[in-house]
Amino acid sequence: MALFSFRKPAAPAASGADLEAFLKGWSIEVMPRTAEKVADFRAILPLGTRVYIAHIEGTPIEEMVATAKRIGDEGFAVMPHFPARIIKDKATLTDWVSRYKDVGVRQGLMLAGGVATPHGEYHSSMQLLESGAFDGFERLHVAGHPEGNKDIDPDGSDRAVMEAARWKTAFAERTDAKMAMATQFCFDAAPVIAWVDRLKAEGVDLPVHIGVAGPAKLQTLIKFAIACGVGPSLKVLQKRALDVTKLLLPYEPTDVLNALAAHKAANPGFGIEQVHFFPLGGIKTNAEWVTANGGLSGKPARAA
């Protein structure tokens, strides 16, 4: 049973080569507590893989920096989150950036953060970008929302989101740092394709690193999808839950990635540059799936 309902009658089919090419340079997200469960990232990830470190409210900066140092020392590009709404003031931001620089970090993901009330003077990623604190960083990524963000646009539109995206594109033109838009995870290719095309039409030319949920139990994914505000593509999971033959099987991102890989192969100028995984079913499980499905793009640095 197909999991997608595309409007176009015939979607191109991906080849194994298409998927391998699409997964090249993929990244993955961890938290300090999940990173602790991995004995050696070199046993599961290709050398140089970008590893985002999610900064959840309440996590001490010392734990974040220690995790960044450990993963960087193992040979991976580290990109910690900088959630604006949990950063108290410029002094705190400057301290965080300095600590990360001391352990070799030169990349960061700017985002507002899922906190209703800001802890201090920052409430948006644009304020962080304008702060000047990230001089010397080689990469500055920002967040993207293919299915909208009601925290930003409560009316359900994407007016404010698109306005911010255009501002970030203009900022990218005046900075030396490489920029890209890393997105929330989605489960359906159709709204992603429409959104990426719309970005281009709106004059937003930041490369998209599309967020995809890694293999996980269906119940786990539905819980995270609801909590994170994933919209239209949640129907993909709900439809799967109604199929008793699939209800107990783990979800795998094969269909959505094959569809996106085929679209990219047929449209080389399509704005998705890389895939970013949210390992909701575990880092090792996610990495093993990429190794099994991505050919050389998933080959770990060394055998476990």
Short names for language-model regions:
Residues 80, 168, 177, 210, ...:
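Conserved, mostly hydrophobic/aromatic
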